[in-house]
């Protein structure tokens, strides 16, 4: 599977009106950094071809060709998990690769749609080691926005090498915006934004159903969409329990308002120093270098915020499905159904207490009611599950599979 690097804690750092989420091995909260040059857009010269048909307003988009030796080819991937999903068997593990949902659910996606914008390549990724958001000047950039379905993907081999990882190119840089070649001996900072669905988005690979979803996303301001089906595969629940009332198949549509910037990402294609990978991308004089924007779909289902790799749960979503109480009837859940669900004490759609449970061998569920840990994060609507999901999923933007980025949340949770 695509991912084996885990255990980094995510730190929430507030800068002005945006929240920064950084990654650290010690889990300590860092102090607020000073305002920085975060590699934001510095002009529209893309430094090379980035597709010759803009695909705006629902039109066709031509993915850019390989830019050739010395260039950077930017792709988007949801890993193989966006394509094949998360299976569940009696041998599934919370800490498996991929992780299993601890409550017995297999989850597959029909659509994982994101809108990518403001791709930028900057000089000097190590300008300030204490404040990685501070980078050098923009040397190449590409503006979208690009509407991408990571479940559909494209024809470029993903970083995992798995045939199920489908990745699609959205931009290419053959040279710097000043016409000079990228220096193969130099690393360049790489950053990108995930933004709200936009009317002028370049439609990269959405199918008919994806286009319908994207229209809804434009109306509602979603920047991420997780849409799919969850199927319960665990053992039969105890008679009379609330679990017996949960439908065994649930179709979900989770539209998330969580636009964020992913700044100066670490690069797991390069050699680590200790536990830390270098930041930035590096050209190869003999061939192009693929730079993969990677969306980790597991982040949206974690049970604790600002910490990497906590257990995955689907029970609190399924327990609020439309057919709760008639388990043989497939149910549906939308993000609107979860707005008033309190993560500090989950209840079913009918108001019953939802207990915590574990159906995997490497995780012990706490006694009593299922609760998620906001870990110091507050929400405009206190403890809203919809807001929790959006905030947690926003931490899922990476580079080259597992490269951690400095994450600036451009939204109020």
Model-derived features with residue positions:
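Sec-dependent bacterial lipoprotein signal peptides
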Residues: 1-22
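Intrinsically disordered, low-complexity sequence elements enriched in Ser/Thr/Gly/Pro
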Residues: 1-4, 33, 39, 46, ...
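Alpha-helical transmembrane segments and their juxtamembrane interfaces
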Residues: 16, 40, 127-128
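Ser/Thr-rich, Pro/Gly/Ala-heavy low-complexity intrinsically disordered linkers and tails
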Residues: 20-66
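A short, solvent-exposed, low-complexity linear motif enriched for acidic/polar residues
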Residues: 58-413
